[in-house]
Amino acid sequence: MAAAARVSEVKAEGLLRGACTALAAAAALLVGLSTQTETVLLVRKKATVKDVQALWVLAMAAAAAAGYHLLQLLKCLYLGRVGGARPCRRSSRALAWTCLLLDKACAYTTFATTVAAAQACVVALDGAHALQWTKLCNIYTRFCEQVAGSLVLGMLAAVGTAVLSAASARNVFRHYASLETYAAH
């Protein structure tokens, strides 16, 4: 019974990791490949992701998160196939802790870079009158819409990664004895 429950947990984790992989990859591709060229005062200007450092960092962090989730998805597929062959308890505990720490780092990084890019986009959307920066989204509308879509996908990937880190924490604590075991002794 417990083995069947574990297999279903691995499948659920695999589905969520697949979704996070797709969301993070889509966010990275959408922001990384977004460009728009407009003529402003007889000068052709091209808006790219490299114009705003926070967007470039978002593209790289989302791509790294997608790669990490893909590797973890492959691990889930392997564990789903091998299911019965469990490694020794000590290496399993170390693997669980490693996955938890990596999941936490991925969640924090994805969330932080997405929020930083969103903050930079607010300046592009509203301008900064004290610094005499104009509203850029009035000029580069399509570029700003694509970046906004990337921010939504990045935030969904961050939320999914946070859920995965909670599942990883549950997996870590499963390797330790419960309080009832200590109370019985």
UniProtKB/Swiss-Prot annotation:
Cellular compartments per GO CC = plasma membrane
Query: Is Transmembrane helix among this UniProt entry's keywords?
Result: yes
- Location(s) in or outside the cell: Cell membrane
Q: Which residues lie on this side of the membrane: Extracellular?
A: 44-53, 126-146
> Where on the tree of life does the source sit, at the highest rank?
Eukaryota
Taken from the record's topology, the Cytoplasmic segments are 1-22, 75-104, 168-185
The residues that cross the membrane are 23-43, 54-74, 105-125, 147-167
Topological type in the membrane: Multi-pass membrane protein
Keyword vocabulary terms for this entry: Cell membrane, Membrane, Transmembrane, Transmembrane helix
Give yes or no: UniProt keyword NAD. Answer: no
Q: Which PANTHER family match?
A: CASP-LIKE PROTEIN 2C1-RELATED, CASP-LIKE PROTEIN 4A4
Q: Which family does it belong to?
A: Belongs to the Casparian strip membrane proteins (CASP) family.
Kindly state the subunit structure of this protein. Homodimer and heterodimers.
This chain's protein is named: CASP-like protein 2C2
